[in-house]
Regions:
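Carbohydrate-active catalytic/glycan-binding domains of CAZyme proteins
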Residues: 23-568
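Bacterial N-terminal signal peptides
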Residues: 4-16
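Sec/Tat signal peptide C-region and signal peptidase I cleavage site
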Residues: 18-21
Length: 568
């Protein structure tokens, strides 16, 4: 069933966003946008009574962090250079999640000017203490900060920067039961690194009242579980207390197919920490990559204890469609944590991450209006005065470029001079591709008035890797055109793949559709509803994968489908 909704996003503060003279530029009007995803694995592995389906957040929702207050659970993810930043979800059963907004909704909180798509916000962590919620995170190349809120669904504070850990990433907060607090983070090792990927985990006390770090800063893990094996990228640390002991969990191995989760234990938050007898406590790196419906790259976990005393882990994982290729990005998964001989274990031995398993022992919620797992379809008729919370922009907006009021029941985008292929803040409103087999379609009215003007649908991975299916002017005729950007070609020049004239009146509605089928994408158009003409079939979808679009060491995002408008 298609979900139709009137869910309002957090209002984006107008401070520092300039009004745009819409009369000076053409506009594209989108009457609706429909996303449909249908992966065969979700048909083959359907949850039964008292079961749930993984991933709990399908698509590009990596680096999950979770917290409980009472019987309410809140979860955040990395957003990199998309705005609003840090999507925020709520659940009461750990299975059904509803996005209630984003943490960083104002330009004063998040400045992403000219940032690469995989820079921006890394690994946010959400915690609650004494009635206040805290979100601590890294903004790549700029440092680390904390924001706070009494109500996580409400407005969050402006950032409080932590200059003491300017060289760090992945900070996490731990509030001890004696009233003290600590920040633990990834940072460079003491002295010169011994090998590529050599990192360390540091800890320092945090003054909650002063919102600053105090006291000595200390390395508690050097390299990883066993530095003699040259482990890489020990990161994403979190400290928990259980039965009087302090547990440190970290990701190790880099966020690709060698990813894992490891654990250490100490008698004090400041250490010393000893690795557990069985490490890693979660990985899939030793399994056959050609197994059916593989889940790989698992790690970057966070733990939560339910009100019933159960422990659960959220973590990232990916669903490749072949040869370590995936366009859906790193997704959020849920598994129980077992305590064995005083140590936590998520998944041992050759066990595979299950798509279906028994639900937590919590009162079941009804399915959310907008599904986040399994197969589903979502249609936005733009009937609300605000955008739904899952819509994203590329980088922080500095001028108004869209509205929902000038054409009620439609989304209007101003065709500005911010172009695909640059690090500009585009006239782009997009949502995640959440399935390997998916489609995005829209109905658009756009009348280009000069060569170069174009508006339509984009399949977007990065500035240098994307497809644009748009309406433009070619030899004085309104035409539909497919433009490919493959950053591997010389000068990263865009390629016009195919062009076709559009029959009918200049201002008539054009329907556009992008269909993903694993590594193949089809691009279609119509002038009447449902009467699709294929403009291009079997286009190379691997350019929208993390592996091709930069590689796993520099590309951390998934593909987006979105609406776009441009005028030179």
């Amino acid at each position: 069933m298609i979900a139709r909704f009137l869910i309002a996003a957090a209002v984006i503060g107008s401070t520092a966003i300039r009004p745009l003279d819409a009369q000076s530029r053409p506009s594209a009007v989108f009457d609706w946008f429909e996303y449909t995803g249908h992966d065969s694995v979700f048909d083959k592995m359907r949850p039964g009574p008292n079961e749930f389906q993984n991933p709990i957040l399908a698509g590009f929702y990596p680096d999950p962090s979770i917290v409980r207050r009472g019987d309410d659970y809140y979860l955040v993810n990395s957003s990199f250079s998309y705005f609003p930043g840090v999507p925020l979800f709520h659940s009461k059963d750990l299975v059904h999640w509803t996005q209630i907004g984003s943490v960083l909704t104002r330009p004063s909180q998040l400045q992403l000017d000219s940032a690469g798509v995989s820079r921006g916000i890394f690994a946010p962590v959400i915690r609650e203490h004494a009635g206040t919620f805290y979100m601590i995170t890294t903004i790549a190349d700029r440092g680390n900060f904390v924001v706070t809120a009494k109500d996580p669904a409400g407005a969050w504070s402006d950032p409080v920067w932590l200059p003491e850990i300017a060289d760090a990433i992945d900070p996490s907060l731990f509030f001890d039961d004696d009233g003290k607090a600590y920040v633990v983070n990834n940072g460079p090792p003491v002295g010169q690194p011994l090998y590529s990927g050599h990192r360390a985990i540091w800890v320092q006390q945090f003054d909650v009242a002063g919102m600053k770090l105090i006291g000595p800063r200390k390395v508690i893990v050097n390299g990883g579980v066993d530095i003699s094996k040259k482990p890489i990228w020990i990161e994403a640390p979190h400290i928990f207390k259980h039965d009087g002991k302090y547990f440190l969990i970290c990701a190790e191995g880099g966020t690709a197919d060698q990813h894992s989760e490891v654990v250490f234990r100490a008698d004090s938050p400041m250490g010393p920490y000893a690795p557990g007898p069985i490490n890693p406590i979660l990985t899939q790196r030793h399994l056959d990559p050609n197994r059916p419906f593989p889940i790989t790259s698992t790690g970057h976990a966070d733990f939560v204890e339910t009100q019933n005393g159960e422990w659960w882990a959220v973590f990232l994982g990916v669903r490749p469609y072949g040869d370590n290729l995936y366009n859906t990005g790193r997704e959020t998964w849920l598994l129980p944590v077992r305590w064995e001989n005083g140590w936590p274990m998520i998944l041992a031995g050759n066990a595979t991450v299950p798509y279906v398993l028994q639900r937590p022992k919590l009162p079941a919620e009804s399915a959310p209006k907008i599904a986040m797992s399994g197969n589903f379809a979502v249609r936005d008729d733009f009937a609300s005065k605000t955008l739904a919370p899952y819509w994203e922009f590329v980088r922080t907006p500095r001028e108004s470029f869209f509205d929902l009021m000038s054409h009620p029941g439609s989304l209007t985008l101003s065709a500005r001079s911010a172009a695909l292929g640059t690090r500009a803040q585009l006239s782009f409103v997009g949502r995640r591709q959440q399935h390997i087999d998916a489609s995005a379609s829209t109905a658009m009215r756009f009348t280009p008035t000069k060569p170069g003007e174009i508006a339509g649908l984009v399949a977007f991975q990065t500035d240098d890797f994307n497809y644009l299916l748009g309406v433009t002017l070619v030899n004085g005729k309104r035409s539909v055109q497919l433009i490919e950007r493959d950053g591997r070609v010389p000068n990263k020049a865009p390629i016009t793949v195919v062009t076709a004239p559009i029959p009918g009146a200049a201002g008539a509605t054009v329907y556009l559709k992008i269909t993903a089928r694993g590594d193949k994408y089809d691009f279609s158009y119509a002038t009447e509803p449902g009467q699709w003409t294929t403009l291009k079939a079997d286009a190379d979808g691997t350019i929208l994968s993390s592996k091709v679009a930069g590689g796993f060491s520099s590309n951390f995002v998934g593909a987006m489908f979105g609406m776009y408008a441009y005028s030179p």
